Amino acid sequence: MIELEGDSPVACFAAEELRRTLQRIGAPALPVVARATGPRIALRYGLGGDGFLRAPDRDGLLLRGDGPRGLLYAVYDLLEALGCRWVAPGPDGERLPRHERVTLPTAGLADRPALAGRGLVIGHDHFLAEAESWVAWAARSRLSTIFVHTIGRGPALGACRLSSWRDRRRALVPRIAERGLDLELGGHHLSDLVPRRLFRDRPELFRFDGTRHTPDRNFCPSHPATQATLRVNGAAFFTAYPEAQVYHLWPDDLLGGGWCACPLCAGLLAADQALLATNILAEVLAELRPDARVSYLAYHDTESAPRVLAPHPQVELIFAPRPRSYAHGIGAPANPINAVYAARLAENIALFEREEPARGSPSVFEYYLDGILFKSSVPPLPEVIAADMVQYRDAGVRCVRALLTGDRPWLFAPLNAYLFARLAWAPAQCAEDLLGNYAAARAPRAPESLARAYQALGAAWHPALDRTPAEAALRRDFPTSRDVVTAPPLDVLDYMAAPRPHSERRLEQLRASEDWIALGRTAWDAVIASAFADGPSLAAERAEWELAASLLHFLVMRQQLYVLADREATAPVLRDALGEAQTALDVLIVWARANVPPRARAGHLLLRGIFQFHLDHLADRQLVLPWQRAALRARRAADARALLADPRLVWELLRTRR
């Protein structure tokens, strides 16, 4: 029997999960009762917390959670001890044993998380559409939070439509609640609260750029009328979405230059202006929902801590180090990029800890699952995630969230999802052992080969991720001009135009990746040869791996092209290098046409077009004649028109908030 004391909905769900899964792996149907009269598994829970214990006793086995959610984790821990595995969402990520007789473990244990908060950020409608499987996986992986990252107006290329959440929340909120997961909502919505349509009659509400007021970015947070508008529309947002425990209403997503320079804002850094707006929203939230919080985002031009203002008690710090290096842990002292971000995190934590910190503060927003940052193919990062979790824990971070986004749905979920969930709970685990556990669940007939394939891919990607400060300085917002051939956008991995010797050294390091990829392909051949019923699932996972390998090859060829141009190579040599880079890009396009579903393909190819602009930029600068430049731009305009023939993409690019 399963004996459950109490009527918490989360505890009841835990009991049902235990009953159902035990039966699936070979146990008899066990009734759930309030008081057992014979051998039983007893389920108990306290007032709150994620820790749990498992203890054999004279009547069977006791599972006790610090709170109802801790009890649910105790159930999943017991099921894992019996051989159950959930390494990815959905049926392909589940592996359940089949026992003739289920024997309960005789050893006891006690466990609790190193980080109080461990969150999955659902950051695109692709993933919101399959959120049921992600929510179930998150609970089984001992994550504590689901954050639905949304956008109101503008293209939703890296977030869910707020209207999509409204369409889905009736189905998803009960699933999140029955598992005891916290729910967070929002994104770059701050400008939505001061609508641009007000500019015509009230230009003073909007930022002063040094010469005039403009409605292009953010607003003037110091103007009393702006603050009044924030209060009214902030209250409306909080009231419209009462299901959230944390609200994220962030400034515009840009590298810098989006805040106000009027006399009222004189002396306020970008960080202070952002915190001023957030504090106003926190005051409103305190009146409506004293139990909820609103986040302050330290990101890009607000990474450095505010100098003038202090946070409201209901403001939670969330630090987002997107431009960091993912070749090393965030606290690696020898890495000149990450050392800066570790210092900025520390100064933000110091500011927030001087006040009475909000319950989830300080927290970090990480990018281990970001298909936009990593160009639609996330590299495996076991050692980096492990090092990060240790550093974040030791720095006093209470919660780490990982952004799940991209320009297409995955064929199979990235390995980093499994690694992040496990390491956020217990950072001291050996990353190599975790990879082995994953491989044993995914490819039980060839686990060593699958582990080698991922180790090879990680080694191949390392030099692509190990940027220098000179390379990191090359980023450029999109769009930067009307002529994207002359000034194409540059993101974190677009460092090919760095000055010598950085570009030369990067090319030399990148070329070594080809040998690692060859080793990985050999390992994958062994995995596929051993596959049986899991063949289609493993083939999908390999397709994702191959995309990562092909993407890396393109980065090598692009780097080679730019280095040769910098060496002033002859035109024939440059044309050959351009042809090689174009062929590598064409491989990515062919992969997309075969594997990206039609509903997402145009958006994916639109972002792939940025790679084409990088090649065109070099050709325009070094190879084509003046009269050919117009023809080059005409071809790219024709490509854009072909993509825009897809009405779904046109709608996405033109639609505004519903």
Segment roles from a protein language model:
Residues 1-9:
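Right-handed parallel beta-helix/beta-solenoid
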Residues 8-17, 21-25, 54-243, 254-268, ...:
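Feature activates predominantly on carbohydrate-active enzymes
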Residues 12, 171, 179-180, 228, ...:
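Substrate-binding groove of N-acetylhexosamine-processing glycoside hydrolases
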Residues 30-50:
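Short, well-ordered secondary-structure micro-motifs within conserved domains or adaptor modules
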Residues 40-44, 120-123, 146-147, 293-300, ...:
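Short, hydrophobic beta-strand segments that form beta-sheet elements in well-ordered domains
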Residues 46, 66-68, 252, 322:
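Solvent-exposed coil/turn segments that connect beta secondary-structure elements
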Residues 147, 184, 248-250, 318, ...:
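Conserved beta-strand positions in the central sheet of alpha/beta enzyme cores
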Residues 250-254, 298-299:
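Short, well-ordered beta-to-alpha junction loops that form the rim of enzyme active sites
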